[in-house]
Amino acid sequence: MRNSGKIIFAVMLLVSMLPLTSCGKSEAPGLSSGGVGGNEGGTSEEYKYPKPSQSAIRLMTYNSYYCRGNTGTPAVSQTNTENFARVIKTLDADIVAIQELDKGALNRNKRDLLQEIADATGIDYQVVFAPAADYMGGKIGPGVLVKRSLGVKDTKTVELPGDEGRMLVVVETDGFVFLGTHLDLNDEARRQSATIINEVSNGYRKPVFLAGDLNDSHRWSGGGAAFPVLTNEFAIKSSTEGTLPGQPNETIDYI
């Protein structure tokens, strides 16, 4: 693994900090967790989690719910897309794994949701979408936004097993590799996916980070389905307070 003086922030609307020399594939001394809960009222001042320095790099995972909103009656709207993008912009995320995206769906004006999110942030992101399944004449799947300033060397997608179509997004930058995904609800599919993810990560000689909605938890009976496999190569770097408020054992989003 390459040494670096930079700091990585892991964000799933919960924050932790670690040196780049302590990548997601190994435990590291000096790790400190932010342990801050989810956003209850938009992007307030206390929710910005300022970076400690200009050289800090912030990683993030965020399930978009197709930008339908999480209050009132869920509905697709430009306002919801802009609200979603505002969180990313406020946190100044350098690279973001996003789940539940659509592209070209006839019932959603054939929008390219990931590109719309990127445009709404006003940040110079490279967009990487992984079409995982057919939906209403278009595609749905996960994606990644990565700042071009990180020096993107390569991007690719890897098919994963599942009752629904699943994909892994791989983004290699100058300093590290970032994997973004949304794993299946089927236990065996998640176990098989974890093996594939480990194999992909072992193909690189630099720090590798995995981020996404894993539909799995290290707190579940037996350590979950995917985690006993993933923890052979990865260590949890994000907060584990809980994906949903009031449900501390229901963390399923991780970096």
What does each model-found stretch correspond to?
Residues 77-84, 97, 110-113, 117, ...:
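Stable alpha-helical elements in mature extracytoplasmic
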Residues 58-64, 84-110, 178-181, 193, ...:
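Active-site beta-strand/loop signature of hydrolases that rely on acidic residues for catalysis
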Residues 10-19:
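Bacterial N-terminal signal peptides
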Residues 22-120, 134:
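N-terminal, active-site-proximal structural segment of metallo-dependent hydrolase catalytic domains
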Residues 109, 126-146, 161-164, 215-255:
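Active site of divalent-metal-dependent phosphoester/diester hydrolases
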Residues 64-68, 101-105, 132-136, 150-151, ...:
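Solvent-exposed loop/turn segments at secondary-structure junctions
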Residues 1-9:
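Bacterial N-terminal signal peptides that target proteins for export
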Residues 48-60, 140-142, 147-152, 163-180:
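Beta-strand-turn-beta hairpins that frame and shape the catalytic cleft
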